[in-house]
C-alpha cells in the first residue's frame, strides 16, 4: 500500500496527500475491532526499512505500551512523521513519557482507550484524562453522532479547543452509500454505524466529513 501511495502521489494533481498507517504495533486488548490478537514488537529493522523506501507516510498510529513503541515514536518524529497514540490503555505517567518520546496526537479520542476507572478500591485516571492534562497534545474525534455523545463532543471542544481538535471520519469503504453493506460477516451496519457482529464494539463510521462538521456545529458548538 505504501509503494502504491508513493506512485499515486507522483501523478499531476494527485488527490492523495500522504499515507496514514494504523498498526500493527497496537495493544491487542484494545484493538479487537481491528482483529489484532498478538503483541507486535515495534521492530526498528522493519519500520526503518519501510520509511527508507517510501516518503509518503505522514502519520503512524501505535500503542505506547507496546515493546519498542517509544523508540519508534522518536524515530518517526526525527523523520518528520506524526506519531499518534491509539488503541491504548496507558495512564498519566506513561502518557507523559509517550508525549516526550514524540506521541503528540491522540487518534479517535475516547474510542479504544479508557477513561477514569477503578482497580479494587482505588481510582485512577485513564488515557483520556491524561491526554486532557497535557495541554499541547492534539486530539481527533469521530463526530458522527454515534461514536461519541454530544456531551463528550462539547467537553473535548471546551478543554482542547478548536486549535487542538480535529475531526476524523474513521469511515468504512461503504461510507456515503445509500444502502451501506459489508461483505465481512464479522461486521454489521446498524444504527448508522459499523459494529462488530457480536455488538461488543464499534468498528468505524459510515459518515462523510460534512456529517461530522454538521454534528459538531449542532451538538458541540
Predicted segments — roles?
Residues 3, 39-139, 147-165, 186, ...:
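Histidine/acidic residue-rich metal-binding segments in metalloenzymes
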Residues 17, 88-90, 166-172:
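A generic structural motif
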Residues 23-25, 110-114, 143-147, 169-175:
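Glycine-rich beta-alpha junction loops
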Residues 123-141, 157-169, 174-221:
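His/Asp/Glu-enriched, well-ordered alpha-helical/loop segment
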